[in-house]
């Protein structure tokens, strides 16, 4: 089970960190769940619950009495501590047990981050509640960010996680093959293409890498809405158009995020071939420098320099993001040092992280040429997980 692998990984991360304990504090997770919780406890909670990983390697789950048996059955927690009336006394007792009195200023890591939504899982209300519970104890004023544990825990994939991601990629590539060999017809609207893909996903029991509404992104020709838009019933696929699709499938709770494009016609015009070659070369430039130890913004700069050197405007987004349980999975971002990205582009790439490499250019008379690949970081570089698209494909049906 993946959560057992991730708990073991968490033990090592906490042991090597500046934290005394890492504390994930949640309640009623049906509508609002801390993004890290499914990594370490793949079970929805009902009452206030505290999941603690100590520097010693011991793990504790302080949970409501009716949740306790399920957490024991999941395994991985050294002690499951149930409560009925209030979590406060049990939680403080576990902190006393795990943090020696010789530690004069304990560091209790909680899930907060100003730059990473996947590491920012504690709500403001739960933060205030936890703060009030610790008042008057030796742990008052000891809450700090655990992003130095949460971010690498999510980012650095286990073998089981990589296997699930590769499965999602294969499913996505299979849907692209089905789409152009069987389903898509010239004259179809964006919405028809979008609905057909969703029907196949639902029929086969897959999930979505991001919200169902707007997945996949479908663009037909030059009049289509760029970016994360909704498909149109009025815009149709015609001769001379580029069909562009951005699709993220989730299988076994892990996602893909892949973009592909096709030209509608008997042959690809030279100016579109040139654009495609420039996009592929920019992805190559990013892949050439993507390796452990490099900062995310440096990878983006390599791709940005390549696309502008080819005569095209720079893209208005990051060249790559991490993929895991979600298509956009937080952590180090392969993006420019813009305010909107916080410190994510300053992060350092590490082995076993999975990233996209993506960018595109708009062709005024045809549509968007945009490709998105997926790679995994190796010991000294990166390896493509997707079957690459390196030339514009033709769609003549």
Question: How would you name each of these model-derived features?
Answer:
Residues 1-397:
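Active-site neighborhoods and metal-handling regions in enzymes and metal-associated proteins
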